[in-house]
Design a protein with these regions (language model features):
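ATP-dependent small-molecule kinase phosphotransfer cores
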Residues: 33-135
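Conserved lysine of the Walker
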Residues: 17
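A glycine- and Lys/Arg-enriched "phosphate-lid" helix/loop adjacent to the NTP-binding pocket
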Residues: 104-185
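Pre-Walker A (Motif I) flank of P-loop NTPase domains
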Residues: 2-6
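P-loop (Walker A) phosphate-binding loop of NTP-binding proteins
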Residues: 12
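Hydrophobic positions on the alpha1 helix immediately C-terminal to the Walker A/P-loop
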Residues: 20
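Hydrophobic anchor at the beta1->P-loop junction of P-loop NTPases
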Residues: 9
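Conserved small/polar residues in nucleotide/adenosyl-binding loops
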Residues: 208-213
């Protein structure tokens, strides 16, 4: 049997990824389409322990000072464990997976740390090989990128609880404006590089509603 399909919704922090996944789930349920949904990092699993430590600042408060290679391994292990324990058989038997973030988020947040073009390309090639060849994780069938400029996403995140402790205190990515700007700028390049489907969340300075997206 052919392997299944993996559809990823990614985007800048606060862009509405979780909301759009929920709307897809409701539509699939209504139409009787079988699927599995997953969110990364998988905070409900022990496999995300190092990710939580990283985002809480236990390895340092400045994400720029933490190697993108090292940080990426934390997320990759979480994805591997979640895939092996949660949906490998389902996917290999033709199942449909809806993912809120994926390897794509590492591309955005970690590659954005690297200023040199050649070094950034080297990192992206390494990450692809690491997750899709070494770990043999599924390559996305399609990535939908929610493009929301930082000035809008930060306003939406102001009063939002973080997903680790569910408190208002932001993680080291969310509270670092420069990191978010670098990640956003990198994402705009990756959309073209990997042919992601870009969904613009703002038009003429007006924020689209979740239904419009």
């Amino acid at each position: 049997m052919k392997p299944g399909k993996l559809f990823v919704i990614d985007g800048t922090d606060g862009s509405g990824k979780q909301t759009q996944i929920q709307k897809l789930k409701e539509r699939f349920d209504k139409e009787g389409i079988d699927y599995r949904a997953v969110s990364f990092p998988n905070y409900d699993s022990d496999s995300s322990a190092l990710v939580k430590m990283y985002l809480k600042g236990e390895f340092g408060d400045d994400p720029q000072k933490i190697s993108p290679y090292i940080a990426s391994t934390f997320y990759a292990v979480d994805r591997y464990a979640t895939f092996k324990k949660g949906y490998e058989d389902y996917y290999n038997n033709g199942g449909i997976i809806l993912a809120d973030r994926y390897t794509t988020a590492n591309m955005v947040h970690q590659a954005g740390k690297i200023k040199d073009d050649k070094e950034r390309e080297k990192f992206l090639n390494w990450l692809w090989d690491f997750e899709f060849n070494l770990y043999e994780l599924p390559i996305p069938t399609q990535v939908f990128f929610l493009n929301m400029p930082i000035q809008y996403s930060q306003k939406l995140m102001q009063d939002r609880a973080n997903k680790i402790t569910h408190e208002e205190k932001k993680d080291i990515h969310e509270k670092n404006k420069q990191h978010l700007e670098d990640a956003y700028n990198e994402a705009c390049k990756l959309v073209k590089k990997y042919n992601w489907c870009e969904i613009k969340c703002v038009n003429n300075c007006l924020l689209y509603t979740s239904d419009a997206a």
